[in-house]
Amino acid sequence: MDHPEYFHDLLDFCFKTELNIAHKAAWILEIVCEEQLELLLPHLDWFFEDIPNVKKDQAVRPLSKICLMLAKKFYKKKDPKVVMALSNKHKEIMAECCFDWLITDQKVACEAYSMHVLYLLGSEIDWIHPELKTIIEQNIHQKSSGYRAQGRKIIGRMMKDKLIEK
């Protein structure tokens, strides 16, 4: 992002859900975070305070992907900046949002990102994996082929890692 001084404004537009451009701002935010996730770190309190209020699926998908970016940087890459910035409260809100997105009617991409985020969060928060498995198994037969593929993949990983029982 050539002008990081506008990041605050971009985030502000993402969470002005009454505006018809909020979802477009969320798309741009996703692209910016793919390139410079560290720009979001000073704003995580605000991000996680407002993310539960976003309901439009066009905005939820990019926000769920940003949650996945944060979770991967925290749990897989162990990025020191993300490890310092992402608090337990942030992770709790992230888990709540991801579970909400799994049990409400969302697009498959959002559901897939949510499953992956919860899989990663479950390595630290022990109650997540059993709940995630239950939700996936309850929904797998009536959801799309993309949901089924991601659900089988996540359950397979949890079983392989001996995080859940068959």
Regions found by a protein language model. Give the residues of each.
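N-terminal interaction modules that seed assembly of large macromolecular complexes
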Residues: 1-38
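HEAT/HEAT-like alpha-solenoid repeats
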Residues: 8-19, 45-55, 96-106, 130-143
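Residue-level detector of extended alpha-helical repeat arrays and alpha-solenoid scaffolds
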Residues: 22, 56, 60-63, 111, ...
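Hydrophobic residues within the alpha-helices of tandem HEAT/HEAT-like
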Residues: 28-34, 63-76, 113-123, 155-164
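Helix-adjacent hinge/juxtasegments
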Residues: 38-91
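Structural helix-adjacent loops and short alpha-helical linkers that scaffold large soluble proteins
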Residues: 39-40, 127-130
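A charged, amphipathic interaction segment
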Residues: 99-120
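Eukaryotic acidic, Ser/Thr-rich intrinsically disordered low-complexity regions
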Residues: 133-166
